[in-house]
Amino acid sequence: MSRSEDLYARAQHRIPGGVNSPVRAFNGVGGTPIFFQRGEGAYVYDEDKKRYIDYVGSWGPMILGHSHPDVLDAVRQQLDFGLSFGAPTEVEITMAEKVCELVPSMDMVRMVNSGTEATMSAIRLARGYTGRDKIVKFEGCYHGHSDSLLVKAGSGALTLGVPNSPGVPADLAQHTITLQYNDIEEVKRCFSEIGDQIACIIVEPVAGNMNCILPVEGFLETLRKVCDESGAVLIFDEVMTGFRVALGGAQAHFGIVPDLTTLGKVIGAGMPVGAFGGKREIMEHISPLGPVYQAGTLSGNPVAMVAGLAVLNKISEEGFHQTLGTKADRLVSGLKQAADEAGVPFCVVSVGGMFGFFFTEAEVVATFADVQKCDLSKFKAFFHYMLEEGVYFAPAAFEAGFISQAHTEEDIDYTIEAAKRSFAKLV
């Protein structure tokens, strides 16, 4: 029995399902989840000391790679001053200033402790600001596990096959309108009928929780237009894309300015951090300035702030994202060529330091329906073949992959060669 198998058996006695987040349980691929002991650069090491090239990156935060010295040094220095005060600190201001500098649509920002908390708070703020109840989201997009947003959600909810989580009251879910991602005409119809009742649209500008789906031409522009016409708030959930697909996030990459933005993952460098912010006139409705309540004991935690600030300073260096994107392109083009040579139907996509792949005959995967048509059995087999080769992709077909600064050309070349061997086994 491997150390991971032993730990998983032990974990299931005290932790529901043996994990603290469902996608970690390997339900999407089968088998025993791997328990990791440490990470360094582009690599993670399991409890049996086996090394893997890591393309999960803690689901996105590790844009510099694991255990980056700048981040660790910043955290060590802060530890000498204390862990938490529940009071204002200067580093919170510095962090807020940096975020607003990098994301110009954010006049003000509020720090929280997770992406879920950020999206939940942004929704509440939009409702309070507009005086409306209804919200629009898109099928297959995941915005955390708050009740309003678990209707037809992506990510782990897709893996579990639970489109609407038990425990979400029907009278609450009725205020959530779910439309098809990338369906421009459906958006227009919805807003022509009830636009004056809608508080906000929340959207992943790149849908990273049903793998990696890019917006079709005109989709994000349409969202901006209908919100302008109806008075609804446009929220970009950039928990995943923020600082990753471009320094200014997906909004900078696509040139669309939202009213509110939610952030997480990269902003915390692996620490539990989220944030939401946007137009001053909207943000001034948040307590203590306004009546919309939001609070958190550990919000703006100084250890998390210094870690996040270290990452933001590093990724602000000239050429960082160009290099990141080049690495991702090299990886997915190599995977695609390997699949084609093996005769395996395969579709790839990448944007900035984020990528996805699908086992499908389709040349483009653009909707939730497209994702559902992909060959999950081939993905599961490929995942385990690659794991045996020492390459760790996301253990679910509905999750995006991530490149870090630490990945080398040699890492990528090895991954492609391992994929060639793995594809050969699928034929």
Swiss-Prot record:
Its keywords, alphabetically, are:
Cytoplasm, Isomerase, Porphyrin biosynthesis, Pyridoxal phosphate
Give the source's domain of life in one word: Bacteria
Isomerase as UniProt keyword = yes
Which reaction does this chain catalyze? Answer: (S)-4-amino-5-oxopentanoate = 5-aminolevulinate
Modified residue annotations for N6-(pyridoxal phosphate)lysine: K265
UniProt GO cellular component terms: cytoplasm
Q: Name one GO molecular function term.
A: glutamate-1-semialdehyde 2,1-aminomutase activity
Q: What is its EC number?
A: 5.4.3.8
Q: Which InterPro entries match?
A: 4pyrrol_synth_GluAld_NH2Trfase, Aminotrans_3, Aminotrans_3_PPA_site, PyrdxlP-dep_Trfase, PyrdxlP-dep_Trfase_major, PyrdxlP-dep_Trfase_small
- The primary location reported for this protein is cytoplasm
Q: Does the keyword Isomerase apply?
A: yes
Swiss-Prot/TrEMBL cofactor(s): pyridoxal 5'-phosphate
Which pathway does the protein contribute to?
Answer: Porphyrin-containing compound metabolism; protoporphyrin-IX biosynthesis; 5-aminolevulinate from L-glutamyl-tRNA(Glu): step 2/2
Q: Which Gene3D superfamilies match?
A: Aspartate Aminotransferase, domain 1, Type I PLP-dependent aspartate aminotransferase-like (Major domain)
Looking at its record, which EC class is this enzyme? Answer: isomerase
Record text on subunit structure and interactions: Homodimer.
What this protein is called in its record is Glutamate-1-semialdehyde 2,1-aminomutase
